[in-house]
From Swiss-Prot:
It comes from Syntrophobacter fumaroxidans (strain DSM 10017 / MPOB). CDD domains: cinA. Coiled coil: none annotated. It holds the Pfam family CinA_KH. InterPro entries: CinA, CinA-like_C, CinA_C, CinA_KH, Competence-induced_CinA, MoaB/Mog-like_dom_sf, MoaB/Mog_dom. This is CinA-like protein. It comes from the Bacteria. NCBIfam families: cinA_nterm, PncC_domain. SMART domains: MoCF_biosynth (SM00852). Belongs to the CinA family. PANTHER family: NICOTINAMIDE-NUCLEOTIDE AMIDOHYDROLASE PNCC, NMN AMIDOHYDROLASE-LIKE PROTEIN YFAY.
Length: 424
C-alpha cells in the first residue's frame, strides 16, 4: 500500500498538577490525539506529569529517545509552578535566552492593561536557545532538536487548539507529507455491550483490506472506528465501505443508529422530519436535559414543539392531566405515570409524538421497591405506545444523563421500527 511509513509517530506530554489531582479532565490530550489521528498522524505515547521540574525533564528525555515528533502542553505561564521552559533547557541542554520580540509584545500588552513589568512575566520570555516563538500573543514555542520537531503549547484549551490547528499540524504535514489520503469513519452501535461488539468482530480481517478497527464506549453507545490510509480518498472510502458492510452484517442493522456525527438526537430528528411529525417532551427527573439535547440540533424547530418540566406531582396533574389517583396508587415513578405524562404532552402540545420521563436520581428518595436510579420512560406515537423501566447506577448527574440517553434510544427504536428506515 502507498502510505506514510508506520514509524512516523509521536509523543504527547501534558503537564499540570491540576490534571493529576483530578481538578480538571485532560481534554487537551483527547483533542490533540483526535486531531492528529483525523489527519493521518499517530501518537504512540501519551504522558501526564505534574509541575515538578524533574518529572518534566525525565519525561522529555524518554520521549526524545524514539519519537519522531513531540507535543507538550502546559507550564508556560508566569507562576512559580510553570516550569516547562526550565525543564526543556535542562533536557535539551540549551540555555535560557530572552526572546526580545516576545519581551516587547508582553510589555505592550501589560501597558495596555495598566500593569507593570515583573520578573514573573519576564520568565515567560526566557526560551531555550534556538527556540522559535509561535503565537506571539500567547505562550508557545518550537524547537527542532536533532531533527525531532518539538512543539510547546499553552495549557489553556482555546490557545492550544488554535496553535495546534494553525501551526503544529500544518508543520507536521510539511515535514512528513502523506503519500496519498486518509479517512476515518465512526459506526455508532446501540443496544450492545462493548464485549459483544468485540466478540462479533474479533476475526474480521481488516488489516488485509487496509483498514484499522477500534472500539470506543461512549455512554450507552459503542463506537466502532474505521481508519484507512491509501493512495487516494476514493480507495480509502472503498476500503472502509467494504469493512463497514461486514460490521453492519455481523452486528445487525437494528443496532446501527448512525455514522460519524449522526448522534441520536440528530437521527431521531431526521426520522420525525421524514414522517412530518412533531413532538413534545414531558420531563421530571431529567429536568430538561432531554429537551436540551433535542433542541441542540439546528433546525429542530421543524419537529420539536415544546417541553413540560413537571417536577412535582401537582405539576404533573396541572399540566399533563396525570390523575391524583394514579399517582397515589402507582407512585410518581411508575410506568403508568410515565405513559400518562407522554399522553398528556401529546394532548397539550397537539403533536403526534411525545416522551415521558420520571425517575429517582438520588441521592435520597429511593426505597427497597424503587431504589435510586429507577427511571420509567414512555414513548407515544400515532401508531403505538411503548414504556420501559430502567435501573441506572451512578451519582445523581450520571443517572439523569443516562435517563435522557435512554429516552432518545427508545424514541429511535420506535421510529426505526415504525418506518423501517435504517442507517444508510
Amino acid at each position: 500500500m502507498d502510505e506514510r511509513p508506520p514509524e512516523i509517530s509521536g509523543s504527547l506530554l501534558t503537564i499540570g498538577d491540576e490534571i493529576l489531582l483530578g481538578d480538571i479532565l485532560n481534554g487537551n490530550a483527547r483533542h490533540i490525539a483526535l486531531e492528529l489521528r483525523n489527519r493521518g498522524f499517530r501518537l504512540d505515547r501519551m504522558i501526564t506529569v505534574g509541575d515538578r521540574e524533574e518529572d518534566i525533564v525525565s519525561s522529555l528525555v524518554l520521549c526524545l529517545a524514539d519519537a519522531r515528533f513531540i507535543i507538550v502542553t502546559g507550564g508556560l505561564g508566569p507562576t512559580d509552578d510553570d516550569r516547562t521552559n526550565a525543564a526543556v533547557s535542562r533536557a535539551f541542554d540549551r540555555p535560557l535566552v530572552a526572546d526580545e520580540a516576545y519581551v516587547g509584545r508582553l510589555k505592550e500588552r501589560l501597558a495596555e492593561r495598566g500593569q507593570a513589568w515583573s520578573n514573573e512575566v519576564a520568565k515567560m520570555a526566557e526560551l531555550p536557545a534556538g527556540a522559535v516563538k509561535i503565537g506571539l500573543d500567547m505562550a508557545g514555542f518550537f524547537i527542532d532538536h536533532g531533527n525531532v520537531p518539538c512543539y510547546f503549547l499553552p495549557g489553556v484549551p482555546g490557545e492550544m487548539k488554535f496553535l495546534l490547528a494553525e501551526v503544529v499540524i500544518p508543520d507536521l504535514a510539511r515535514r512528513f507529507p502523506l503519500r496519498g489520503a486518509y479517512l476515518k469513519e465512526v459506526v455508532r452501535v446501540q443496544g450492545m455491550v462493548e464485549s459483544e461488539v468485540n466478540r462479533r468482530l474479533r476475526d474480521l480481517d481488516c488489516r488485509r483490506i487496509g483498514v484499522e478497527i477500534g472500539y470506543l464506549p461512549q455512554g450507552s453507545e459503542n463506537w466502532v472506528t474505521l481508519f484507512a490510509v491509501a493512495a487516494s480518498e476514493e480507495e480509502c472510502r472503498t476500503r472502509i465501505e467494504k469493512v463497514r458492510e461486514e460490521v453492519v452484517a455481523r452486528l445487525g442493522e437494528k443496532h446501527i443508529s448512525g455514522r460519524n456525527d449522526e448522534c441520536l438526537e440528530k437521527v431521531v430528528g431526521e426520522r420525525l422530519r421524514e414522517r412530518g411529525w412533531r413532538m413534545a417532551a414531558a420531563e421530571s427527573c431529567t429536568g430538561g436535559l432531554l429537551s436540551t439535547r433535542l433542541t441542540s440540533i439546528a433546525g429542530s424547530s421543524d419537529y420539536f414543539d415544546r417541553a413540560f418540566i413537571t417536577y412535582s406531582n401537582q405539576a404533573k396533574q396541572d399540566h399533563l392531566g396525570v390523575s391524583e389517583e394514579m399517582l397515589r396508587v402507582h407512585g410518581a415513578v411508575s410506568e403508568p405515570v410515565a405513559l400518562a405524562m407522554a399522553e398528556g404532552a401529546c394532548r397539550g402540545a397537539r403533536v403526534e409524538v411525545a416522551l415521558g420521563i420520571t425517575g429517582i436520581a438520588g441521592p435520597a428518595g429511593g426505597s427497597a421497591e424503587k431504589p435510586v436510579g429507577t427511571v420509567c420512560i414512555a414513548c407515544v406515537t400515532p401508531k403505538e405506545k411503548r414504556v420501559e423501566k430502567h435501573r441506572f447506577e451512578g451519582v445523581r448527574e450520571s443517572i439523569r444523563q443516562s435517563a435522557a440517553q435512554a429516552a432518545l434510544l427508545l424514541l429511535w427504536r420506535v421510529l426505526t421500527d415504525d418506518s423501517n428506515l435504517h442507517c444508510r
